[in-house]
């Protein structure tokens, strides 16, 4: 039995859930998200919320059970609260700024890096060295954060680069004479 999948997903007030076969549409105060579930699981709407269950007792169905429940919970949380990722920029002269629909990053290259902000994602630069990414789709928020971090990931000697807030960077000692 799945330790994650056996619990129902609570649906808060103000959120409407539409089930159409394997298609799930969730509408809330922040927007609307759609999800197509795999054929190995079923979703039922009850008093306690959305209940995800495997269709049959196969290994794939059990594997998809917990995953599907988590995906359903993520879209319900996304349309009610949304998701946020914070990036920190460390390094002399490294900074970020919003320019229209682009995020401009100065990361020590000979040129500025322009990152086009995708639809459904909101990016704010609270400080020149801090980027806050918000949105209703958890996967999209994480993907955007990973792409921005990928331009100049933190290096292990001085810690320069773009890192997630709260991320621990394994440090190395420099050369010795």
Swiss-Prot record:
Instruction: Check the record and name the InterPro entries matching this protein.
Output: Ribosomal_uL6-like, Ribosomal_uL6-like_a/b-dom_sf, Ribosomal_uL6_a/b-dom, Ribosomal_uL6_bac-type, Ribosomal_uL6_CS
Which family does the record assign? Belongs to the universal ribosomal protein uL6 family.
- GO annotations of cellular component type: cytosolic large ribosomal subunit
Instruction: Cite a single GO MF annotation.
Output: rRNA binding
- Please describe what this protein does: This protein binds to the 23S rRNA, and is important in its secondary structure. It is located near the subunit interface in the base of the L7/L12 stalk, and near the tRNA binding site of the peptidyltransferase center.
The beginning of the lineage is: Bacteria, Pseudomonadati, Pseudomonadota, Alphaproteobacteria, Hyphomicrobiales
Q: How does it assemble?
A: Part of the 50S ribosomal subunit.
Q: Which UniProt keywords apply?
A: Ribonucleoprotein, Ribosomal protein, RNA-binding, rRNA-binding
Alphabetical list of NCBIfam families matching this protein = L6_bact
Which species is listed as the source? Parvibaculum lavamentivorans (strain DS-1 / DSM 13023 / NCIMB 13966)
User: Lipoprotein among the record's keywords?
Assistant: no
Give the GO terms filed under biological process for this record.
Answer: cytoplasmic translation
SUPFAM superfamilies found in the cross-reference section:
Ribosomal protein L6
**Which Pfam families does the record cross-reference, listed alphabetically?**
Ribosomal_L6
Q: What is the name of the protein in this document?
A: Large ribosomal subunit protein uL6
């Amino acid at each position: 039995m799945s330790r994650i999948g056996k619990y129902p997903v609570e649906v808060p007030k103000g959120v409407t859930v539409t089930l159409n076969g394997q298609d799930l549409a969730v509408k809330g105060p922040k927007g609307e998200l759609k999800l197509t579930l795999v054929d190995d699981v079923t979703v039922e709407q009850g008093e306690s919320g959305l209940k995800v269950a495997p269709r049959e007792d196969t290994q794939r169905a059990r594997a998809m059970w917990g995953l599907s429940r988590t995906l359903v919970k993520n879209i319900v949380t996304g349309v009610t609260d949304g998701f946020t990722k914070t990036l920190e920029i460390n390094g002399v002269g490294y900074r970020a700024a919003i320019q229209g629909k682009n995020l401009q990053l100065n990361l020590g290259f000979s040129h500025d890096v322009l990152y086009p902000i995708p639809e459904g994602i909101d990016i704010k630069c609270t400080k020149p060295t801090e980027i806050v990414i918000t949105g209703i789709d958890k996967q999209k928020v994480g993907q955007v954060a990973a792409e921005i971090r990928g331009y100049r990931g933190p290096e292990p000697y001085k810690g320069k680069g773009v890192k997630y807030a709260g991320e621990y960077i394994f440090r190395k000692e420099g050369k010795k004479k």
